[in-house]
Swiss-Prot record:
The encoding gene: rpsU
GO CC list: ribonucleoprotein complex; ribosome
Keywords in alphabetical order: Ribonucleoprotein, Ribosomal protein
Record's keyword annotation contains Nucleotide-binding: no
Molecular function terms, GO-annotated: structural constituent of ribosome
Coiled coil start-end: none
Classification via HAMAP family: Ribosomal_bS21
Assigned protein family: Belongs to the bacterial ribosomal protein bS21 family.
Pfam families membership: Ribosomal_S21
Protein name (Swiss-Prot/TrEMBL): Small ribosomal subunit protein bS21
UniProt xrefs under PANTHER family: MITOCHONDRIAL 28S RIBOSOMAL PROTEIN S21 (PTHR21109), SMALL RIBOSOMAL SUBUNIT PROTEIN BS21 (PTHR21109:SF22)
GO biological process: translation
Length: 71
């Protein structure tokens, strides 16, 4: 759990913004959303594999774009 120390004479909205930023860096909200509902192990593996395939396709597209010369 991210903890922030409120500085002297620090406005509440600034402290809240720092807290939100630290929560985002820690990945708390994404973890909560991921654990909100039970996901079967097969579904989890399927989603991870689809993500890897998509990542690979994007990487290959970027590499092919680099090799193309536009002159």
């Amino acid at each position: 759990m991210p903890i922030i120390k409120i500085r002297e004479n620090e406005p509440f909205d600034v402290a809240l913004r720092r807290f939100k930023r630290s929560c985002e860096k820690a990945g708390i909200l994404s973890e909560v959303r991921r654990r909100e509902f039970y996901e079967k192990p097969t579904t989890e593996r399927k989603r991870a594999k689809a993500s890897a395939i998509k990542r690979h396709a994007k990487k290959m597209a970027r590499e092919n774009l680099k090799k193309t010369k536009f002159y």
